[in-house]
Amino acid sequence: MSKIKVLVVPSDRSGVGKFRSVDPHIFLQNQNPEDFHVDIVYEPPYDDVNFWTQYEIVAYHRSIGPDFEKANRLIQMLNSLGVITVCDIDDYWMPGKEHPIHDIIKVNKINEKIVANLKVSKYVTTTTELFADEIRKFNKNVVVFPNAINPNEPQFKEPTQKSDKLRIGWLGGSSHLHDIQLLNDGFSKLTSHKDKVQYVLCGFDTRGTVTEINAQTGEHTKRNILPPETVWAQYEKIFTQNFSIISEDYKKHLLKYNQDSYENEMNESYLRVWTKPVTSYAKNYSKF
């Protein structure tokens, strides 16, 4: 019996790509080596029909590549050729107004393009039954695959570091400023207990660019973002209550925005943890 050939097109090389696309399909092949052959291709040749028709199943996250409309046409072509198309989605297509790219999504109608891809896909996989019910308004063939990890992966087996403090950790991305702001009152109320608590902010990152627009000429200029301008710097001010819960010396160290070590950081009430690759990021859980 011939193997079922599966093509996986991840949306990125970070968390979503790893945990929603790459790892599950590697597991599928490893558990069923006689039945499945899986190829993972980040940038497939979109216009090569022979490439696509060598597969029985094509799985992708939200879209096959960044061009949603081109992906939609490709999905319909694959359907017509008998290739099973499977669209995975883990986030609602229209984030709230507090989300940093809400306006970009709305202006470019990306939400509508995502829904259009859901409609033409043969099957849709998602994270929860609640979200599945929303998707079923557009496509009845929805299967729930909850987010999952491989607990035997080394990054999830890191032993928890010992501490006399109650450590409160946060791991997340750069789109959660509004969520962190909701915690501000809680952080403020715990200020009097700063000697018994340590906040651990994971994923700190100063990379990125900003686009400045000349009001007179309309000219767009892109430059590297300055560390104090990053959302992570704003997170840090909330966690530390504008640096009031840490020593003045540690504050000076943090405001250098470099990754040099600080000898006494474990005795401070706040710990900055710089971002790590997706294959080792979960080691941060050992810090709280």
Where are the regions a protein language model picked out?
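N-terminal pre-catalytic "stem/leader" segment of glycosyltransferase-like enzymes
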Residues: 1-66, 212
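Active-site proximal beta-strand in glycosyltransferases
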Residues: 78-95
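Structural alpha-helical scaffold elements that stabilize or flank donor/cofactor-binding regions
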Residues: 51, 116-117, 284
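Nucleotide-sugar donor phosphate/pyrophosphate-binding loop at the beta->alpha transition
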Residues: 44-46, 84, 95-116, 151
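Donor nucleotide-sugar binding/catalytic pocket of nucleotide-sugar-dependent glycosyltransferases
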Residues: 119-156
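Membrane-proximal helix-turn-helix segments that form the acceptor-binding/catalytic region
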Residues: 76-80, 104-123, 137
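An aromatic- and histidine-rich active-site surface loop
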Residues: 62-80, 180-182
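Conserved catalytic-core segment of nucleotide-activated headgroup transferases in glycan assembly
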Residues: 12-27, 150-156, 161-284
